[in-house]
Amino acid sequence: GGGKKKTGLVIGAVAVVAAIAVGAYFVLSGSGSSSVADDGPHKLITPATVLGGQYKKGDNSGDDGMSKSDLKDAEGWGVKNPKDVNANYQSGDKSNPLSMKQLTFGGVYGTIDDPGKAVDNMFAYMKSKQEKEGTKDGELLGSPKAYNPSGLDGAVLKCQSLKVEMGSSAGSTGPKDMTMPVCIWGDHSTLGLVMPVDFASAMTGKASTPEDAADIAAKLRKDVRVKA
């Protein structure tokens, strides 16, 4: 029915935005500073479940990795010996789309001298890409804001809202646009981008609050970041 179609559109919008966001990993230069302690080499993994088993990895997770040339270029942008991971996680029942929540996660790991700079410049890259290509795939609102949820140890974490136009295809009852938070953490080994979407909230035009998204990002980091 109409509800299912609208949910499909929201999922489609999230997928598009996630694809853009993942491209942001690799311009990591510019200004910024951080005083994050270095707790030794870590890598990123994509376990079958995260957040206490609440979210399960989607069937199509991890298909679209970065190309060798992207990873090679990344060394010049501040990540030494970079490797990448990405996955989509879902909770809820597919037969009841409005009960579902989705987490889009992408990251790189290697050696990062300045985590704050890396986070700032991922956001700056997304903004410059949007300025070049227009807002058809989403418009970043305001500026990235730092969050420090409980459980965030030794990392910089910032979130920024992204507005996605749903267009006429959303129908008369669906939202004309949807705002979703994009959160990025940085430490001396890993950079992670997290986009949580609650589909029931998304139908009202707001996928999640930045505070909730920051909290989820901090929890997810604990699940996907392990000693190298």
Task: Spell out what each predicted region is.
Residues G1-A48, G52-Q54:
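Hydrophobic single-pass membrane-targeting/anchoring helices
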Residues K6, D114-A118, S208-T209:
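Alpha-helix capping and helix-coil boundary motifs
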Residues A13, A21, G106-G107, G192, ...:
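Small-side-chain structural scaffolding
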Residues G30, M122-K127, A202-M203:
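Short, low-complexity, polar/charged sequence segments that are solvent-exposed and flexible
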Residues V50-G52, K56-P181:
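A small/polar (G/S/T-enriched), proline-flanked helix-loop surface module common
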Residues P144, P149-A228:
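Extracellularly exposed regions in secreted/surface proteins, prominently low-complexity, repeat-rich
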